[in-house]
Amino acid sequence: MEKIIEKSIYASRWLMFPVYVGLSFGFILTLKFFQQIIFIIPDILAMSESGLVLVVLSLIDIALVGGLLVMVMFSGYENFISKMDIQDNEKRLGWMGTMDVNSIKNKVASSIVAISSVHLLRLFMEAERILDNKIMLCVIIHLTFVLSAFGMAYIDKMSKKKHIIH
């Protein structure tokens, strides 16, 4: 009976598979990326420097979110479902198979901080059109992300130290 329960629990990890496949639909961001590029090309020479910086920040934001999607999909699949069998080691991403759950959390947290930083920079560039309390709220949210990322990294570092000592 115990073996059946253990096999069932172990097999249930495959219930996460649709979640990781579903994340790939987030790559619809690619369409947004190219849509922004296509719409900016005719106006690029007439655009102000700050307007161009805002567009570039938008593109960077999309790239960061896309990278976050790849990292979560690949590492989540490898950590919780099955190792990816990639025959050609040259095509295998260097970090694949090396990230444990804590390092994934730290990478996700730092990616969220980077994405939040881009949003905050974009907000500051349009500060004259935005209410002060909205800017303050965004800064507070960003600082919360930063403190959370530091906290998670600190906890991870302390838990690794504890394992070395014991």
From Swiss-Prot:
Keyword vocabulary terms for this entry: Cell membrane, Membrane, Plasmid, Transmembrane, Transmembrane helix
Subcellular location(s) of the protein: Cell membrane
TM spans (from-to): 14-34, 52-72, 135-155
Pfam hit, one: UPF0114
Cell membrane is among the record's keywords: yes
UniProt keyword annotation of Disulfide bond present: no
Signal peptide: none
Record membrane topology: Multi-pass membrane protein
Superkingdom of source: Bacteria
Chief location of this protein within or outside the cell: membrane
Gene Ontology CC annotations of this record: plasma membrane
NCBIfam families, A to Z: HI0507 (TIGR00645)
Family named by the database record: Belongs to the UPF0114 family.
The protein's name: UPF0114 protein in repA1-repA2 intergenic region
Native source species: Buchnera aphidicola subsp. Rhopalosiphum padi
